[in-house]
């Protein structure tokens, strides 16, 4: 059977079944459900990031307005259902993202896919410290995490915090693009979405930076509480260390998993695929026909 015939059979669900006798039918039924779950979890995270950046953009108005909207956001995301939904979506999205990475049999891919994967792995490195330093300290020590004290704490880390905004938003927009691109109405709204997707992070960066600079000017020459102080410094240091260990453990586990998958794939027997013109390719089971074609 040629590669064209195999592709046609796979596309129609007839003919070749590489998973026959190995629970292939149940696997194929499971994959769409996992894809939908990954999509839904991504949309939940996108909604959180969207409202968070809109809140940052209000720094162009005033810190007081930022805090008012922040309170509204907390009503949703810090409620018990909102917390379960948000952190559940975070765990599910990461788990399914790592799963899809383990299933990949070649690193030859479109630029968009490579960029999304790279940004996705950069997010935990910058995000864990941000979350533990804000909500983590609020839960553990009751540290005020309204905008004024948070801006004071984050302003010395302006570069990394700004980079976090760009990375998270970039990863989210690439995922949203992959989801919306097949929609028949997408070409008509694409220019508007591109404009909004470009403007929002710029406004968010301008908003939080302007608010932090304005606060720095107001603090000049007056006594203001600094953080971490003697009471919270030890806890902040411990949380930072825990965050670093979590990131290293996650990256190490993913790296070892990828190595294990690669070794297992190489140990499996090869199959033959014939192309038009008489070209014959030997490949190990696992990759899709498209991935095999890219590798050869």
What feature does the model see in each segment?
Residues 1-269:
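Membrane-embedded alpha-helical bundles that constitute the cytochrome b-like, heme-associated redox core
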Residues 270-295:
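Membrane-cytosol interface motif
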């Amino acid at each position: 059977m040629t590669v064209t015939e195999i592709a046609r059979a796979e596309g129609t669900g007839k003919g070749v079944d590489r998973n026959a006798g190995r629970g292939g039918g149940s696997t194929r039924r499971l994959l769409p459900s996992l894809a939908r779950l990954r999509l839904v979890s991504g949309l939940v995270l996108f909604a959180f990031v969207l409202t968070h950046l809109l809140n940052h953009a209000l720094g162009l108005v005033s810190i007081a307005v930022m805090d008012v909207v922040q309170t509204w956001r907390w009503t949703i995301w810090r409620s018990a259902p909102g917390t379960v939904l948000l952190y559940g979506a975070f765990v599910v999205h990461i788990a399914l993202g790592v799963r899809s990475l383990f299933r990949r049999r070649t690193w030859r891919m479109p630029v968009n896919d490579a960029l999304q994967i790279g940004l996705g792995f950069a997010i935990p490195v910058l995000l864990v410290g941000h979350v533990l330093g804000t909500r983590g300290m609020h839960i553990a020590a009751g540290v005020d995490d309204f905008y004024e004290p948070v801006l004071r704490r984050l302003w010395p880390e302006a570069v990394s915090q700004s980079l976090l905004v760009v990375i998270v938003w970039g990863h989210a927009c690439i995922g949203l693009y992959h989801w919306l691109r097949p929609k028949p109405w997408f070409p008509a709204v694409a220019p508007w979405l591109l404009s909004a997707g470009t403007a929002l992070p710029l406004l968010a960066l301008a908003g939080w930076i302007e608010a932090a600079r304005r606060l720095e000017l107001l603090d000049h020459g007056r006594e203001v509480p600094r953080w971490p102080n003697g009471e919270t410094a030890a806890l902040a240091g411990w949380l930072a260390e825990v965050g670093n260990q979590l990131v290293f453990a996650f990256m190490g586990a993913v790296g070892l998993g990828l190595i294990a998958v690669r070794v297992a794939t190489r140990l499996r027997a090869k199959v033959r695929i014939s192309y038009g013109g008489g070209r014959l390719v030997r490949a190990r089971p696992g990759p899709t026909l498209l991935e095999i074609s890219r590798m050869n």
